[in-house]
Amino acid sequence: MASKSKVAKALRTPKFSTRKENRCKFCGRPRSVYRKFGLCRICFRENANAGLIPGVRKSSW
């Protein structure tokens, strides 16, 4: 779990737009965040398997 100060800092609007940090909306993880969903890979997988993300389903071939 990310520290509360880092999450709070990421939520603030930065002075320069290039300083915006992508963090997971659920857990605050800074790495491997999918921009389209705003979730890290772990939270994305959990929510997709639970059917909470519309239009996403597990692929098989």
Curated annotation (Swiss-Prot):
Its cofactor is Zn(2+). Binds 1 zinc ion per subunit. One of its GO terms (molecular function) is structural constituent of ribosome. InterPro entries: Ribosomal_uS14, Ribosomal_uS14_bact, Ribosomal_uS14_CS, Ribosomal_uS14_sf. Keywords: Metal-binding, Ribonucleoprotein, Ribosomal protein, RNA-binding, rRNA-binding, Zinc. Pfam families: Ribosomal_S14. GO terms for cellular component: cytoplasm; small ribosomal subunit. GO terms for biological process: translation. Zn(2+) binds at residues 24, 27, 40, 43. Binds 16S rRNA, required for the assembly of 30S particles and may also be responsible for determining the conformation of the 16S rRNA at the A site. Belongs to the universal ribosomal protein uS14 family. Zinc-binding uS14 subfamily. Part of the 30S ribosomal subunit. Contacts proteins S3 and S10. This is Small ribosomal subunit protein uS14. It comes from Rhodopirellula baltica (strain DSM 10527 / NCIMB 13988 / SH1). The gene is rpsZ.
